[in-house]
From Swiss-Prot:
Has the structural arrangement of an alpha-helix connected to antiparallel beta-sheets by disulfide bonds (CS-alpha/beta). Keywords: Amidation, Disulfide bond, Ion channel impairing toxin, Neurotoxin, Secreted, Signal, Toxin, Voltage-gated sodium channel impairing toxin. Belongs to the long (4 C-C) scorpion toxin superfamily. Sodium channel inhibitor family. Beta subfamily. It comes from Tityus discrepans (Venezuelan scorpion). This is Toxin TdNa7.
């Protein structure tokens, strides 16, 4: 019984450490990756290429992805460089 409790504790600890992020994909220009004029599966395919679990074209007409690795750059309001002429 003690081993089982220890196993469960380790399992939950690993689950808490290995987190994935969700967010809008960011293009090379620093803007959200648009999906307005693209095929319906564009966002899901693009998210998969970046090792995300799934994705869709959100109401803001930008690709939103789930469960992506931390190395994938996502758009954030605080670090927004879109339209600022780098």
């Amino acid at each position: 019984m003690t081993r089982f409790v220890l196993f469960l504790s380790c399992f939950f600890l690993i689950g808490m450490v290995v987190e994935c992020k969700d967010g809008y994909l960011m293009g090379p220009d620093g803007c959200k990756l648009d999906c307005l004029m693209r095929k319906g599966t564009f966002c899901a395919e693009t998210c998969s290429l970046r090792k995300g679990k799934d994705g869709y074209c959100y109401a803001w007409l930008a690709c939103y992805c789930y469960n992506m690795p931390d190395w994938v750059k996502t758009w954030e309001r605080a670090t927004n460089t879109c339209g600022k002429g780098k």
